Amino acid sequence: YGHQAGDACLAKVAGVMKRSVRTPADLVARYGGEEFVVVLPSSSLNEAALVAERIQTNLRETAMPHAASAVSETVTVSMGITLSTAGDTVTGIIARADEALYRAKQQGRNRWVKLNPLPGV
């Protein structure tokens, strides 16, 4: 994608994500470059995983062409999922989500990985 086409593609992805969340209180925001953050207040890892599945299903059904991709002919997303816990900072939460995203990409992309901040849970 060129710059304008890339921005249009990202806007479509954002629209798919916004349609995929649970409530109007859920937040979808671009987080620089090609990354987004989705904040799901008062949700569990399993609820967040359901939203991730819905995002992937809705994006697959939208079938936006991505000819330059080695992963898929259409636009896909990889996602990292985590929870906030007492005493967390925004930086810490983002770092955990980023680690989960990295793991998703290492496992082949077009998938999500959840990273539980609570050991043994």
Residue ranges: model-predicted function:
Residues 1-10, 16-17, 32-33, 37:
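Catalytic-site-adjacent helices and loops of nucleotide signaling machinery
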Residues 9, 37-58, 93:
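Short helix/loop segment flanking the catalytic signature motif in cyclic-nucleotide metabolism enzymes
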Residues 12-23, 41:
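Short regulatory alpha-helical coupling segments
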Residues 14-18, 47-65, 98:
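Alpha-helical scaffold within the catalytic cores of cyclic-nucleotide enzymes
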Residues 27-30:
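A short pre-motif secondary-structure segment
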Residues 37, 78-81:
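Short aromatic/hydrophobic contact patches that present stacked aromatics
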Residues 46-52, 82-121:
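Catalytic-core segments of nucleotide cyclases and related cyclic-nucleotide turnover enzymes
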Residues 73-77:
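PAS and PAS-like sensory/regulatory domains
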